[in-house]
Amino acid sequence: MLAVAILAAGKGTRMKSCLPKVLQPLAGSTLVERVLTSCSGLQPQRRLLIVGHQAQEVQQQLTDWQGLEFVVQQPQNGTGHAVQQVLPVLEGFDGELLVLNGDVPLLRPSTIEHLVNEHRSSGADVTLLTARLADPTGYGRVFSDQQGRVSSIVEHRDCSDEQRHNNLTNAGIYCFNWKKLAAVLPQLCSDNDQGELYLTDTVALLPIAMHVEVADPDEVNGINDRCQLANCEALLQERLRNYWMKEGVTFTDPASCTLSEDCQFGRDVVIEPQTHLRGCCNIGDGCQLGPGSLIENAELGHGVSVLHSVVCDAKVGNEVAIGPFSHLRPGAGIADQCRIGNFVEIKKSQIGEGSKVNHLSYIGDAQLGRHVNVGAGTITANYDGVRKHLTVVGDNSKTGANSVLVAPIVLGSDVTVGAGSTLTKDVPNGALALGRSKQLIKNGWQ
């Protein structure tokens, strides 16, 4: 049996933020949710989140995580004190306890699984994750024999000059035999510079301590301030881009683009500079995104181009051209082979197959049929000051430039709207609609 305890009680004062540190965003998710996701594949029997500072906010953020148990640490008196709070919660539990940190979000699931498997196969009381750092200054050094058995952990300030040449460091991630740990946790003391109880001290109290070295030291990067947050964001973004490039996606300027882990791409997608994908995005084969575009929680079919545009909570069919400077807002649905052009905004509207909204238009709360041509400057006046109303335009209809369709209104199929018209009444199939004043010329005006 396996229980997981995630340490998430710290104040994170160096963040200088109103937001709890573990709720800081990283590539579209929070730090602590990334840690929770990384260990989900182990299917632990118990998942404990140790909270303290702004505990209520952390709990509210994680209400959708079924089976997650919250353990409150008050006051926050070190990592050992945090795990002591688990003692009554896991009374009678017989298995392993995996201890993770809520501010170490880059751990791969495979690394965690390897740590747990090695711990189980070795029969150790504790197995700690270690990392070899190019610059280990400030980190505790781990000393072990060739079989990986840990003899001691020495804090940097206590190391001799010779010991400081050892670059094997403690990553602060452990897998314990829970019963053995529970027996020694009460023995921890706060006889140190910080006056806190350190979980590290349990290693010296347990007879058999082993270690597993992480292959990529970047996985155990902790986050304490905005600089480290930015560094982890860059590392995670590079990891995501490299994965998708190996899957057939082209980034013409990778470092200028960002993704979320919930993005999915078909083959031969080209992502141009300064293009950002957030949330859950599903991008079909052969799409060209950017430059300078934002796509969020959107579904794009095959062969879609998005140039200098924003697509948010929208669904787009195949072979659609969007932009430049278009804005597809929530509820926009664009069918196959449409053209959404310069400075066009579409909100909560369905645009039928082959239709074109090419220039300077606002289409809101509307249903456009197939092969509709919307003239430059056409506006659906959907709001009466109290409620939004629907505009319906039938197949093969077209509006002239600078037309206003005052909703609620229905235009039938094959309707033509004269340029400059303001329409307030329904138009039958095949009709010409004109709603403008007669041109008046007064000669000799000046």
From Swiss-Prot:
Residues 248-446 are annotated as: N-acetyltransferase. UDP-N-acetyl-alpha-D-glucosamine binds at residues 7-10, 21, 73, 78-79, 140, 155, 170, 224, 329, 347, 362, 373. Mg(2+) binds at D103, N224. Residues 227-247 are annotated as: Linker. It is found in: Cytoplasm. Pathway: Nucleotide-sugar biosynthesis; UDP-N-acetyl-alpha-D-glucosamine biosynthesis; N-acetyl-alpha-D-glucosamine 1-phosphate from alpha-D-glucosamine 6-phosphate (route II): step 2/2; Nucleotide-sugar biosynthesis; UDP-N-acetyl-alpha-D-glucosamine biosynthesis; UDP-N-acetyl-alpha-D-glucosamine from N-acetyl-alpha-D-glucosamine 1-phosphate: step 1/1; Bacterial outer membrane biogenesis; LPS lipid A biosynthesis. It catalyses: alpha-D-glucosamine 1-phosphate + acetyl-CoA = N-acetyl-alpha-D-glucosamine 1-phosphate + CoA + H(+); N-acetyl-alpha-D-glucosamine 1-phosphate + UTP + H(+) = UDP-N-acetyl-alpha-D-glucosamine + diphosphate. Acetyl-CoA binds at A376, N382, Y383, A419, R436. GO terms for molecular function: glucosamine-1-phosphate N-acetyltransferase activity; magnesium ion binding; structural constituent of carboxysome shell; UDP-N-acetylglucosamine diphosphorylase activity. Binds 1 Mg(2+) ion per subunit. Residues 1-226 are annotated as: Pyrophosphorylase. Disulfide bonds: none annotated. Its EC number is 2.7.7.23, 2.3.1.157. Keywords: Acyltransferase, Cell shape, Cell wall biogenesis/degradation, Cytoplasm, Magnesium, Metal-binding, Multifunctional enzyme, Nucleotidyltransferase, Peptidoglycan synthesis, Repeat, Transferase. Its cofactor is Mg(2+). It holds the Pfam family Hexapep. GO terms for biological process: cell morphogenesis; cell wall organization; lipid A biosynthetic process; peptidoglycan biosynthetic process; regulation of cell shape; UDP-N-acetylglucosamine biosynthetic process. Its main location: cytoplasm. The active site is at H359 (proton acceptor). GO terms for cellular component: carboxysome; cytoplasm; membrane. In the N-terminal section; belongs to the N-acetylglucosamine-1-phosphate uridyltransferase family. Homotrimer. HAMAP family: GlmU. Catalyzes the last two sequential reactions in the de novo biosynthetic pathway for UDP-N-acetylglucosamine (UDP-GlcNAc). The C-terminal domain catalyzes the transfer of acetyl group from acetyl coenzyme A to glucosamine-1-phosphate (GlcN-1-P) to produce N-acetylglucosamine-1-phosphate (GlcNAc-1-P), which is converted into UDP-GlcNAc by the transfer of uridine 5-monophosphate (from uridine 5-triphosphate), a reaction catalyzed by the N-terminal domain. This is Bifunctional protein GlmU. It comes from Prochlorococcus marinus (strain MIT 9313). The gene is glmU.
